Amino acid sequence: MKTSRLSTVPTSSSSTSTSSSPSSSSGSGSSTNTVGSRLFTQTKVDNSPLDFENEKELQKKLDDIVSEFRNKDKEWTFRLKALQILQRIINGNGIEFKGWSSMLRSISPALIEQLTELRSTIVKEACASVSLLGFRMKSKFEPFALQYTQALIRMVPVKTTIISESAHQTLKDILESVSTKNLLQTFLDASLDQHNEQLRKRCSEYIYIVLSRAIENDGMILVSSVPALEKSIQKLLIDGASETRQMARYCFWAYSELNEKSATLFYTHFTPTTQKNLFTVQEHLKGDQLEFCEKLKNSLFEEEQHQKMVEDSNDLDFDLNDFKKDNNNNNNNDNNNNNNTSTTRSKTPTTGRASGLKIRSSTNTTPTTTTTTTTTTTPNKTQSSSSTSLRSGSSIGNRTEVSSSIKRPLDASNIIRSKSSLGTTRKDVITGGSGGGGGGGMSTSSQSPISKTPTTMITKTASSSSPNLATSTQSGRYSSIGTRAITTSLSKQSSSSNLTRSLPPIIKSPISPPGPTPPAPTLTKSKSTPSSPLSTPTPSKLSSSTNTTTSTSTTTTSTTPTRRISSSTTSSPIGSTTTSALKRPSTLTSTPKSSSSSSSSSSSATLSSTKTPSTTATNSTTSSATKKSFITKTNPTDEQTTTPKSITKTTTTTTTANSTSTSSIKRRSDNVDEIDIESLEISLNQDNKLAFNEISDEISNNLRDAKKGLSFYEKELTLDDLENNNNNNSNSNSNSNSNNNSKRSSVSSFTNSIKESTTADVDFNWLEDSVHDSLIDDDVLDFDENNNSTYIPRNNNNNNNNNNIIKEQQEQQEGEQQEERQQEQILDEDDELMF
């Protein structure tokens, strides 16, 4: 793009012409007086250059011009004449002096004031002077170009045409005259102005001039300005003004000539519309820009063709299920031969939601219908005579469950339709000795092998003018609106078998081998919440159904409030206790065991109760009632036997069930051995007290050592004394119960099981449990005279050792202090001698 300069630039010394302005040749109201004639036509002005002999005369003349610029009291014509004189000085030999740069720096502020003047004539002459400076000084004007550019860029968006056009032309002259590396950033910032369309349009021209000069000359654009340049071009390409967008396209192709690689990447950031519009200026491009444009266009065309081929290949979507249809059909035929009652779906046109269309088949039936269906099922095939399917008037879809091994199409003429719009379910109802589920809202077809027997179901006739009264086997949401079909009641045997099949698997009880006592199951006691007076056992742990199963359970009944055994097991305020089911051991025992081994888990529970000091209150020997545990004896039979001698259920007892519990005890008294739990509790409480005393002594010793700052190794806890005490207690208990041999043997075996559990679980975690602060103090803890007497000497020895260590440390400190005092005395004596 070629830029035109102002005609005020002199070409020779005799440049004064006698051409008159159009206004002088024509009247003042002539239409030929245009802006272009006023800008680019010369009036009768003396533009002859002024030459000076020395710098003093030049300095004096410039001072006079500056004084005229700053004198605002006089008319504006004096400033106009001063500007014309400045133009003559610039055309002269004044710019050749060495001090011209400093002189120009002194007059620049005054000249910039004239550029921002409100009077258009003054601004036009000032712009002509600045253009002349750039043309004459070339690169020497570069230090001054930035400050003049910043002043001129503010005059570009002015609405006065003479001012804006003069400033615009002056800026283009400066860009053509000097290096633009320091000026580009000013135009880039102005091009992003969102409020001034005229300024964005002018800045796009300035950017194009800078890019054009950068193509011809090096060093016109700084590398640091490239990101801002790309951002500016991208914004200008989508500007609201068409002229601005057009100039921005030229800027892009000029930028592509500078850096082809960056321009290609920059091109991908544009929208498809912007990319397409970039090629609208292809006809006006020349040289390398045109070559790059054609190359980019060809590459885009190839990419488009490749993308089209990819899309065509994606349209060829093969469904692998089509290739597997034959295999699926073969598999279905094999399954039908193996299972004669397998359900197959008839091939019917898709309706309802599956197809999106409401298809209704034509029916040839009359409003009054009498339907008789006879279905005969044989082991090989199923034959149906006068088969009539019932379907409601729904367009939602059809769900078919036909018990047949032969596929046959659905006869639309035999379909009876109701007014319901809820859908339909077609199926053959088969009743037998042990058929499908009974007594439900929706009938389900059974696929069990029992249905192989020939069965016949004759539906009742229904005569009505409405199809809703036709016989139907549907119920629930798929039933007709008018009436529902009368379903035949199942037999007692089929109901029992269905109920048995629907229940979860039953936990079978262990079979006890022959011996004095059966294998002892684990008895666990659960807490009953006060909110529910009766708690029922879960079906997964105990069997309370009507099925005939074998189970061995332990029932604990109580007619009076139970005495609390330990703090871990508490009774409900209402007085109801719940016993859970007995757990079956993994393997059957080959040797008989004593009945006292059934309390292994109970003993572990009572051992855990020793962690809290509240168990000391459980030593009372009197109770309101005696607790008794009843264990049912069963003879050894096969696991598949279904008739045990006794079947017991776990029950929840309340305070009002006195007579019931008493009668149940009498009925089971023949096969039950009684165990006195009180004797067991006494022995357990004594053992627990011994263990608690031993652990408490160890804790108190550790706390004393910690207070005195001494660390001892953690001592492992041994329960040898506990075992000896257990033996003594068991002997005393056996002597006290000499009249009852069975009781004595059960108690001794029970204590033996306690010793086994205690020796196995040596690793206690007593420190994690809570201990009353009142039991831990500096005094010796005397829980028992006999048990804790052995620990007092140990504590005394520890105290003596600690006192000895403290005394030795104090003596050492006193000795060190005496030595320091002696040294201080010696130093004081030396100081006195010196003085």
Curated annotation (Swiss-Prot):
Q: Name one GO cellular component term.
A: spindle
Q: Which domain of life is it from?
A: Eukaryota
List, as start-end ranges, the regions of compositional bias called Gly residues: 432-442
Q: Which ranges are annotated Polar residues under compositional bias?
A: 396-406, 415-424, 449-477, 631-640
GO annotation terms (biological process): microtubule cytoskeleton organization; mitotic cell cycle
Against Pfam families, the record matches this protein to: CLASP_N (PF12348)
What GO annotations for molecular function exist for this entry?
Answer: microtubule binding
Tell me which PANTHER family the record gives.
Answer: CLASP (PTHR21567), CLIP-ASSOCIATING PROTEIN (PTHR21567:SF9)
Protein name from the UniProt record: Uncharacterized protein DDB_G0280205
Source organism of the structure: Dictyostelium discoideum (Social amoeba)
